[in-house]
Design a protein with these regions (language model features):
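Terminal recognition/anchoring or ligand-binding modules at protein termini
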Residues: 339
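C-terminal, charged and often intrinsically disordered regions of DNA end-processing helicases
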Residues: 229-230, 244-248
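Primarily short, surface-exposed interaction patches in extracytoplasmic proteins
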Residues: 1-223, 248, 252-257, 273-327, ...
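Terminal end segments
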Residues: 260-263
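Active-site Gly/Thr loop motif
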Residues: 237-245
Length: 343
């Protein structure tokens, strides 16, 4: 595939990958036998070396690797996929080191479950949608994360909840928090596909790297309503608001995200211009949906927390909105643990 183009400017692509040889003690002056295309030799169910029709063809080598990866006898592929999906829903994988299933990685907490899920996924069409459905409808996933008196014995035996006797309480990802605020305002753009959107101001710099300023971006621009997955990521200059919520930078490999609770997060969720503008937009929507403060409070909790307020909450929130304004009430709701955390 790399050789199928017209030479331009005198460039002549090589006919295939150059030969690679094992070096004695890593010394380039002492080459030993040539290495042929292959994969891991520790998997007894699959051949360690690829049988390619043309050893020198780069495309044939890649095709052989692809066939090796999706082979039904390859245990690593299916285990790795289901482990990462499990990690997405529970906060940590059955194997806590998703990038390392080897000797230096963590031991699986539920090896039989990992194998069962891997085989089920492999033999049922490899549908990620069906795998998500299977997990979220399980009794394990539907457990509460609240501590109960009956769980005191389990708390003593497994304080870190490795064996999932309750659900883990987790904070929403940075992208989910941003999208949840947009959803509450009614401005979330659900269009799928298309190019990413640059949600920052970009001006030429004195050198190669341009000047990026997130604070000068127009938060009323339609581009700011796209879902977070369509944000343009500038790898070396991440969005400070998203970074404060543990959104990883684009220039690092992050198999497991940090999940912290810090003062900086509280300050960002209360003072950032993005939160302030979304609070104003949310208040505008509430005024259009409710004729008085009581109705607006009722709708506000339905849109942010998915429930109706209690009588005590209703009285307190109405008094707060009357004294400090509906915009500040919306900002308070965006900062509630019930909005930011998943129980």
């Amino acid at each position: 595939a790399a050789s199928d183009f017209e030479p331009d400017g005198g460039l002549k692509p090589p006919p295939g990958p150059r030969p690679i040889q094992i070096l004695k003690r890593g010394d380039i002056r002492q080459p030993l036998e040539e290495v042929t295309p292959g994969a891991l030799s520790c998997l007894s169910s699959l051949p360690a070396r690829f049988k390619t029709n043309n050893v020198a063809a780069e495309g044939e080598r890649r095709a052989a690797l692809a066939r090796w990866l999706v082979d039904s006898r390859n245990p690593l592929t299916w285990r790795s996929i289901v482990n990462r999906v499990w990690q997405l829903h529970f906060g940590h994988g059955i194997v806590a080191t998703p990038n390392d299933f080897g000797r230096m990685g963590a031991v699986p907490t539920h090896p039989e479950l990992l194998d069962w899920l891997a085989i089920w996924f492999r033999d049922n069409g490899q549908s990620l949608k069906q795998l998500h459905y299977l997990i979220v409808t399980s009794a394990t996933y539907r457990q509460t994360s609240a501590a109960r008196t009956a769980d005191e014995a389990a708390m003593k035996l497994d304080v870190d909840n490795h064996f999932l006797w309750r659900m883990n309480r987790s904070r929403l990802d940075a992208e989910c928090i941003r999208d949840a605020m947009l959803c509450a305002t009614g401005k979330l753009d659900l269009r799928m596909g298309g190019p990413s959107d640059r949600q920052f101001s970009l001006t030429p710099g004195s050198h190669v790297t341009p000047i990026i300023d997130y604070s000068k971006f127009d938060l009323d621009s339609p581009l700011s309503n796209r879902r977070s997955i369509y944000r343009f990521l500038f790898r070396t200059l991440p969005d400070p608001f998203m970074e404060s919520l543990d959104c990883p930078a684009g220039d690092t490999i992050t198999p497991v995200r940090d999940n912290t609770v810090t003062v900086q997060q509280a300050l960002a969720l209360w003072n950032d211009a993005l939160v302030a503008r979304r609070s104003e937009q949310f208040a505008e929507r509430l005024r259009s949906l409710g004729n008085n403060t009581a109705e607006q409070v009722e709708v506000a909790l339905q849109l942010t927390l998915g429930r109706r307020p209690s009588e005590a909450e209703r009285a307190e929130l109405i008094a707060y909105a009357d004294q400090h304004g509906l915009e500040n009430l919306c900002r308070v709701l965006f900062n509630l643990n019930e909005f930011v955390f998943v129980n």
